[in-house]
Structures are given as structure tokens and as C-alpha cells.
Amino acid sequence: MKRKLCLILFLLMLVTCVTASGEAADWNYDANYGILRGYNGAGGDVVVPGELDGFTVDVIGVSVFRGETITSLTLPETVLELRSNAISTCDNLTRVSLPQSLVVINRMNFFSCTALTEVTIPAGVRYIGDASFRYCESLRKITFEGVCPAIDIDCFSLLPEGATAYVPDDQLDAYIAAFENAGSEVSVQPSGKNAVIVENNGYVESEFDFDASTGTITSYNGYATYLSIPETIGGAPVKAIGPEAFAQHTYLALLELPEGLETIGDRAFYNCETLARVHFPSTLKFIG
């Protein structure tokens, strides 16, 4: 009897080890950049871990869940960005939980996720790329929690009749305009709540190398996904962005340049391959 019990316990331990090992093998993770680059699991209900190999998961990479047989997806409170097509054509996906940390939903995310019935867009989201949530045939309820993000063309288009976006009362006009500009026919209605304000401008002044005498940012040493460059640094106005100042920053997806900026130097944003949207100020005079 004792031998049988020991054997059963041993087999249970073995199964547990195999399961844990299998879960670890589900992910293709780039620790150098905090990017989840691939999913090798069996589908079903999927919970993405906040850490892999001791490093945080900051970005869901291009096409990670494209066409996968997942039924629900929970993303951790570390994820800042969904890259292009990260989650799309998932025909069985009925539920998704997006984290409050999320800032950027890049183009074609949730495209043709035909079983998805509702979604909540967290307050920190600043940008939703083109064709995201397009052809979601069952999506009837979209809830926005924060200030109106930039919404690109064809987002939330070709949804079922009666699809409704519930938005903060104090942002109603902004959302109506954003949906109209995107070409969406979704009904935009007040949610009964005001916008949750999230301060995520993406910088600390020490991350900029700045020449105060000329007002020039000469380099940027941060890792922001969304960056709103300040009008002043150390009390001096920002007038120029120097040559190659932001070159090869692979995290940067959304950029707002400040009023007062006049010049952008040569190759200032060279090889920023994930940069999806830039807001230019009215004061800009020259781009190198």
C-alpha cells in the first residue's frame, strides 16, 4: 500500500513538473527588449505572465497571437504596447482583459476577432492604430475609461448593428469626433462617469541630454513607449531636436513634440521602426 502511495505521489510530481515545463515552453521571449515574440501553447484560456526569465514583459510583439485558437486572454499589468497584429483573427476569442499599464494598441489589433462580444479600453491608452477592432462581428459593447485617445482610420468599423461605445461624460464630444474621423458608425454614448486621468507622459528630465544654450535635445536615454516631450527642460525652452537624437529607439511608438520646437535635425528618428504616430507642433519650421 505504501509503495502504491509513493508511486502515485511520484507520478503526480512528475506530471506537475511536465506541466510547468510546458508552460515555460509556451513563450518565445526576448529578454533584451522585454518583448514577447511568440506563443507556442495549445490555446484555450491564456494568461500571459508578467515576468519571464526574471524580466518583465513590456511588449506583445508582432503577430504573437495572430490566428491562435485562444478563447480568453489576460495580459499582465506590465504590458505597455501591443504591436501590429499582436492579437488578430482569433476566431474563438470571446474575452480579453487589457491592463491599466497599456498605452499603445498598434494597427490591426483585434482585427476580425469575430467572437469577441465586449471590451474595456483602459484609461492609460493613448493610441489605437488603424483597422483595430475592425470586422469584429459580435462586438456590441466598448467601454472607454480615460481621456479620448488618438483613434486611426477604420478602427471599430464594420461592427454589428447596435454596437455602442460608452465613453466618459466629460469627453463625449471628443469621442464622437474621433469615431467620426475614423469612419466608424458605432453609437457613442455617455457612460455616466468622468474620465480617469492617467499621467503617463513617458519621461523624466534626466533621460534627455540637453544643450540649454541652444535649446537642443542631443540624445534620449529612456525607454518610453509613449513620449510627450516637454516644452522646457531645466527651465530652458526646447527649440530643436539634434541629429540622430532618438535614432534606433525600438520602444518608441507614440510621440508628441512640444509647442516652441522649431527644428528637427538629420536622422533624428532614424530606424525607430515601431514609431506609429507623431504629433507635430505649429511652431515647427525645419525637418532635416
Segments from the language model and where they lie:
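N-terminal low-complexity, Pro/Thr/Ser-rich intrinsically disordered segments
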Residues: 23-27, 195-208
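STAS-like cytosolic regulatory interaction modules
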Residues: 180-201
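Short, surface-exposed terminal/edge motifs of secreted or surface/virion proteins that either
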Residues: 174-180
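Sec-dependent N-terminal signal peptides of Gram-positive bacterial secreted proteins and lipoproteins
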Residues: 4-22
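A structural signal for leucine-rich repeat
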Residues: 111, 134, 154-158, 179
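Structural signature of tandem-repeat unit edges
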Residues: 24-32, 41-58, 68-81, 90-104, ...
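Consensus positions within tandem repeat domains that build extended binding/scaffold surfaces
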Residues: 61-64, 83-86, 106-109, 129-132, ...
